[in-house]
Amino acid sequence: MSQLPDELQVKEVSSGHWSGPNPADDPEGRDVVFSGQILAQMIMASDATVESQKEVKSIHAIFARAGRYSAGPVELAVESMHSGRAWASHTVTATQGDRLLSRGLVLLNTVEPDLMRHAPAMPDVPGPDKSAEGTLGVVFPGAEVRLVNGGDGVADDGSPASYLWFRYPESFDSVAANQAIVSWAQPGL
């Protein structure tokens, strides 16, 4: 398995309690923990708590206040609401000291083929090799972002739609790790 980014290597500190490290350097220079990092750490802590192989089907989080990189690691408390053979649901609370940062609900399901396949058609846009490289990888180091509508991400026709391609160069054996990577990057795109 490829090396996970340090921020996704949550460490168990006691039963149901995890510690999520912050980056060594503040990527944006604002001393504010990025929301995608907290979502990704919630996924990793929740996944580490389930006893059988499950994948995240959904995560919903409310952010109460900003965390600070200078305040130390994000502390994650995972409470199991239900844990069955096929489904599990967890409440994950992210704090720094006595400060509530976020509370999330994570729904997990056994890894199985999706029998319901419906989605809108992919847009007819140029592929990543014909798109301009973007600078949106600042919050998520190592990510490659390609902006279909040009270097600034604004659509040529002035419409509110922007298209981009996102790729992280590593792939992980863990479904949760791959989901965490996308969850980490998505709020910043």
What are these regions (language model features)?
Residues 1-189:
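Terminal targeting signals and extreme-terminal segments of soluble enzymes
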